[in-house]
Regions:
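Short, highly charged C-terminal tails/helix-capping segments
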Residues: 160-169
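Acidic interhelical loop/turn segments
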Residues: 31-42, 102-134, 166
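Long, well-ordered alpha-helical segments
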Residues: 20-34, 149, 153, 161
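Aromatic-residue-lined binding/catalytic grooves and analogous aromatic/hydrophobic interfacial grooves
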Residues: 3-10, 14-26, 39, 48-69, ...
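A broadly conserved amphipathic alpha-helix scaffold signal in soluble, globular proteins
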Residues: 25, 94, 98-101, 144-154
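Short, contiguous alpha-helical
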Residues: 42-76, 125-161
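Helix-adjacent hinge/juxtasegments
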Residues: 65-106
Length: 169
């Protein structure tokens, strides 16, 4: 069985971004119902040396945007990562979903062998083929930050479960 780069990326990003949006909606409702300042959740971390929830969401959506755009070899929209509220995070997800939805299968399929160069926060660069970039770097990074977003909220008492994490499929 073969699977196209498009099938392994765009539908996955859409499903999980929508699911993450749903988890954030539940978190905001939980904060309201329990009279908890939303910043308690937005700034929560799993460990002191990890990013807070806001940054986890920003990084997750950045990977969905970046991986999709790099595979399609198109210019990436730039966002300033200044979100501080649930509403602003939801708006960011909506923007990235809109961008991801513009990418068509013919823009990605057949790009398994293109070269993608990353500079992961340092001057060092890493070179990937399109396929390796998606499967060994992009998707694992995306899922790490989506999962960490979920875990932060669940750890802090938000009633979310596996169905919330996975969303509609």
């Amino acid at each position: 069985m073969t699977i196209s780069l498009y099938a392994a990326s765009i539908p996955v990003f859409k499903q999980m971004l929508n699911a993450m949006s749903g988890v954030l909606t539940k978190a905001e409702a939980h904060a309201t119902a329990k009279n908890i300042d939303p910043s308690v959740f937005l700034q929560a971390r799993l460990a002191p040396d990890m990013f807070p929830l806001v940054r986890q969401v920003q990084i997750a959506v950045d990977f969905a945007k970046g991986v999709s755009g790099r595979l399609a070899e198109i210019e990436l929209p730039k966002y300033d990562d200044s979100e501080t509220t649930f509403a602003e995070l939801q708006a960011l997800i909506v923007k990235v979903l809109a961008f991801v939805e513009t990418i068509k299968a013919e823009q990605i399929d057949g790009k398994e062998g293109i070269e993608i160069i990353t500079r992961q926060g340092t001057p060092k660069e890493k070179r990937f083929t399109g396929q390796a970039y998606l499967l060994t770097y992009g998707l694992p990074q995306f899922f790490f930050h989506v999962t960490t977003t979920y875990a932060i909220l669940r750890h802090n008492g938000v009633e979310v479960g596996k169905r919330d994490y996975m969303g509609a499929f």
